[in-house]
UniProtKB/Swiss-Prot annotation:
Protein's name according to its UniProt entry: Partner of Y14 and mago
Organism: Danio rerio
Record GO terms (molecular function): ribosome binding; RNA binding
Subcellular location(s) per record: Cytoplasm; Nucleus, Nucleolus; Nucleus, Nucleoplasm
Family listed: Belongs to the pym family.
Gene behind this protein: pym1
Keywords on record: Coiled coil, Cytoplasm, Nonsense-mediated mRNA decay, Nucleus, Translation regulation
C-alpha cells in the first residue's frame, strides 16, 4: 500500500487517515529523502540475488510451453529409484488382478463331512458350563477370603494400637473395631464353604 503524500508550500506530508475504529490520525510531516518502511526494499544476500538472476530454463530451451507427452514419465521423473520400482510393482499387481478377475477359476466344491453326534456336543457343552461356573466362583471366593483376612489383620493392629494408648481412635476407627466380630464370622463361613 503506497502512502498518500500531500505537498504544499511548507513541505511534504502524509495525509490524515481514518483508523478502523473511526478516529482520525493527524497529518505527519515527512523529511526529504524519507522512504516509508513498507517501501524499503528487502535485503537480499549475494546467494539469493545470484539465483534470482539465473534463468529457470537451461540455455537453448524455448520459453514457450513444451509439447506434453505421457503423464506417467513426467510423474516418474521426480521420483527416486525405489519409488519408481514400487510404481512398477503396483502396476504389475493391478494388471495381474485384472487378469484374474477376467478369467474366473472354477474351484471344486468342498466335500461334505459327516456332522458330529448331537449327544457328544451336548455333553461337551455341559462340561464347559460346569467348569465355567466353578472357575470364576472359586477365584472369587479365594479373593474374598484374602480380602477378609487382610481387613481382620488391620482391625487387630488398630485394636492393639488403641489398647497401648498410641492412638486415640476416631469415629470411623471405632466403627471398624465394631465390625471385627462380623468379619470373623464371615471368614469362618467362607472357609467352611471352600
Amino acid at each position: 500500500m503506497a502512502t498518500p503524500y500531500v505537498t504544499d508550500e511548507s513541505g511534504k506530508y502524509i495525509a490524515a487517515t481514518q483508523r478502523p475504529d473511526g478516529s482520525w490520525r493527524k497529518p505527519r510531516r515527512v523529511r526529504d529523502g524519507y522512504v516509508p518502511q513498507e517501501e524499503v526494499p528487502v535485503y537480499e544476500n549475494k546467494f539469493v540475488k545470484f539465483f534470482k538472476s539465473k534463468p529457470e530454463l537451461p540455455p537453448g530451451v524455448c520459453v514457450e510451453t513444451p509439447p506434453q507427452t505421457q503423464t506417467q514419465p513426467s510423474d516418474a521423473a521426480g521420483l527416486s529409484r525405489t519409488a519408481k520400482r514400487n510404481m512398477k510393482r503396483k502396476e504389475k499387481r493391478r494388471q495381474q488382478g485384472q487378469e484374474t478377475k477376467s478369467e474366473p477359476e472354477l474351484q471344486p466344491e468342498p466335500e461334505l463331512q459327516p456332522e458330529p453326534e448331537p449327544q457328544g456336543l451336548s455333553q461337551q457343552m455341559q462340561q464347559l458350563e460346569l467348569s465355567a461356573s466353578q472357575g470364576p466362583g472359586a477365584a472369587d471366593s479365594a479373593r474374598r477370603l484374602k480380602n477378609l483376612r487382610k481387613k481382620l489383620r488391620q482391625v487387630e493392629e488398630l485394636q492393639q494400637r488403641v489398647l497401648s494408648g498410641e492412638l486415640k481412635p476416631s469415629q470411623e476407627q471405632l466403627d471398624k473395631l465394631g465390625r471385627a466380630q462380623a468379619l470373623r464370622e464371615e471368614l469362618q463361613q467362607l472357609e467352611a464353604h471352600s
